[in-house]
């Protein structure tokens, strides 16, 4: 966010598209696709040579930077449940997500009471940090939008979180 005489502009930069990534990659397109598929489109990934370096960079960026900042900024006390929610979202990319059902699942499986409003807030925190993006249904109208489940997609691919290649392709 830039600030000029009381006016602010927010610039939301998305990760590189595959076209941008492959242009900067410089090698054959198959190798570029493998790297993009496994490590995503963050520009700094291109400067890392070894798979271990790429994984370490992505993991530290996500866990040590993004999650730490979100947890501290929003004073999240249920850190374990917050991390589990991220795992749930990652494993259900492209599926409808209902915070009330997730709340009931935490109660029945983990014997933890987490209100659906809290789960909704946690997801909003991830959206505000540009980690996930929400896709609402286009086939419903009017009041049906209220309380309607949505799908969530990760802004970039984090290799630590990809449960299956099928879900990863859905996320692309």
Residue ranges and their predicted role:
Residues 26-64, 71:
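Amphipathic alpha-helical "lid/sensor" segments that cap RecA-like P-loop NTPase cores
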Residues 9-12, 153:
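Hydrophobic/aromatic beta-strand patches that form the interior of the parallel beta-sheet core
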Residues 51-172:
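Accessory nucleic acid-recognition modules appended to NTPase machines
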Residues 2-6, 16, 38-39, 62-66:
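Acidic/polar active-site rim loop that often engages polyanionic ligands
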Residues 8, 22-25, 49, 163-167:
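Short, flexible helix/strand-to-coil boundary loops that buttress conserved ligand/catalytic motifs
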Residues 1-10, 23-29:
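Short regulatory helix/loop adjacent to the ATP-binding pocket of P-loop NTPases
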